[in-house]
Amino acid sequence: MGDWLETDAQKFPHGLKGMVQEIHASGFQAGLWLAPFVCEKDSALFLQHPDWLLKVDGKPWCCGSNWSSFYALDIDNPAVLDYLRRVFDRVLNDWGFDLVKLDFLYGAAPFGNVHESRAARMYRAMELLRSWCGQKTILGCGVPVIPAFGLVDYCRVSCDVSLDWDDVWYMRLFHRERVSTKQAINNTVFRRQLNGRAYGSDPDVFFLREENCKLTAEQKRTLATVNALLGNVFLTSDMPSHYTDAQRAEYRRLRTLFEHATQVQTEAENDRLSIRYLLDGTPQKLCFDLF
């Protein structure tokens, strides 16, 4: 992360612009994942521009342990802003991407100072992103939900889902938040009021696959159904070409829910959640335990 203007010629022999053109020719929009406010310790940016890093007591601020660990960039540094402006110009206007998923955005504002609160700093960072992206679609991720209000098209409202139902205790030593399917569902439920008001809610991905996934069939169905009914983004990390006939049928069921369910209402009572909705004019109800 950090070296966003460099392209691997072996993986992308025709460049990213050529790949985007192929995607558009197939009738799809093209999206790209970026983490603009952080850089990895192994990146050229980290090694060549130590003055671009946000520092505490003279030391770069580490804000995540993924990969080689990553560090926050200082959005008060004009050189950082100029670099990021060039990154988005290249990605959106030269390469032609239609959507960017922007992750680890909290790195712009891990703390405030005497002149600016943390929330104000985060909001300023989000305004910068919108100014750089113009009318292109933004999916925000890893950002406090309030500073993103009205500045992104879609926003993650939950923690990351897990390949198991809940996280193991030692993962909390390495991550700022829980990686938990159970907790992600609760986040999606209790932040449902944001959907369509502050932005479109992204509840993270769902799984239908069997391989590399420890969720039971019931747990996978619950996660996917809640995402379809209460979210505005419908994504899976599965490889759909590997689906069985039964998994394809389940995907079609979920897609129908996502596109056609109406009058969705929720009610929580005694640790049990009920979701009522209409599908083709017929009342439907989903019940599950919250905790």
Language-model-derived ranges and their functions:
Residues 1-89, 93-112:
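Aromatic-lined carbohydrate-binding/catalytic grooves of carbohydrate-active enzymes
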